[in-house]
Amino acid sequence: LSTGTIALAESASGSGATFPQNFMASATVAFNAATGHNVSYANPGGGSSKGKSDFKAGLTDFGGSDSAVTTAQAASFEWAYIPYVAGSIAIAYRLDEIKGTTLSLSPATINGIFGGTITKWNDPSIANDMKTNPAWANTQKKSALKGASSVWSTPSLNTALVTVTLIPSVLKSSKGKTVELYNDTKKKSVKTATIGTKGEIAISGNVDSASSYSVKVDGKVVGKYGVVAVNLPDKAITVVYRSDGSGTSNNFCNFMNKAANSDWAVNDAFTSCIPGGSSKVASFGSTFQGQSGSANLSNYVADTNGTIGYTEVSFVSDATRAAKGIQSANVKNAAGKFVGPTAAAASSFVAGAAIDATGFVTFDYKQTTNTTAYPVVAVTYALGKTAKSAKNAVVSDFLTWILSTYAPANAEALGYAPLSGAMQTAGLAQAKKVNSK
């Protein structure tokens, strides 16, 4: 950097949504290294409600939120929404008794679990969901390549869609190497793909329930899958929800309201969303546990057998948590397909959304012909000031850089989905509103 560039370096701080925490931790470091500025995002962010209140109070230069700003939450100064990245909200669980099996859950069953009417893991609703989708288990608890994880789903009876995610450092060292779906029983390769610039690599191949399969990255086994007979345990379900004001809760509750049960409200507070409200949650006692922030919720699920919660998928694929047995369920979409929480599946769902003139995104939960969509998704926003200032100029540059450069190259590797097409174009237009007046 030149002396002139360093002299013009600015600091800008943000707080709020924990949904994009893993993305922002990486993006701020990369932006600062490239520009000499000092953009920071609080870790933990405090949740979307805090992001909105900090921004309104002038405590930050930009806010972080995954949910709409209400009239009461709105700042008195002019500001804009800037949607900058999306991601899947994983239905995360740990159930050691099913030995690595991926759960398949319909919206109705998720409604029952999080609404407190399904209280045991062997409930017929869960069993029936599992019967409608082949039960494949990953028997490899720890990936042989740290920083590489895999998701297995079966779009049809004899077809597997395997998605491998590589964190940025592993992606960099693995470029040009091979991802392989290998039939261990028949000792032959089913499908391969070459690793390029994207951190998420999907391969589809024909499979049969009598064989077991390995998913390999450069010969290292990152997952080992086979069909299993599922014996769901007679065990109490512990629901883990966000206790802070959370955009992840807001988007999860919106999914519940639109896809399963209109009695759910849409709110940053889970206890205000659930039918029956906070008194209902209190009546469940210790079977409902509140945790503040995405990391704490994910840690609780990873550390506690029999639990289920909701969190951005990067917190589940994290190697340390994954080794403890936390997994993500496949969720039934409006087209009737059980789909895993991959970046591609999130992007497929977001492609069916609408974005208004303010930059706010409205999802369509009735995409009955979209077989590839994962239906529990959030778009996360920065809240930026339109007034001209040196700090606001940096915020505008930072968000423009994320949308145009950083997210397209790195979001998938970090467990997120970059905005593309009309959504990316709208996001860039919103970023230009920051520092425009």
Model-found features: residue ranges?
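A short beta-turn/strand-edge loop motif at beta-sheet boundaries
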Residues: P168-K175
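C-terminal segment of classical bacterial N-terminal signal peptides
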Residues: L1-L8
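Short strand-edge motifs at loop-to-beta-strand transitions and within beta-strands
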Residues: K191, G199-I203
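Conserved aromatic beta-strand anchor motif in extracellular beta-sandwich/beta-rich domains
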Residues: L181-N183
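Surface-exposed loop/edge segments in extracytoplasmic proteins
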Residues: K186-T194, V221-G223
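Surface-exposed, short loops/turns at beta-strand junctions within beta-sandwich domains
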Residues: S204-S211
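Structural beta-strand segments of beta-rich domains
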Residues: L157-V164
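Flexible loop/hinge segments at secondary-structure junctions
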Residues: L8-V151, K175-V179, K220, K224-K437
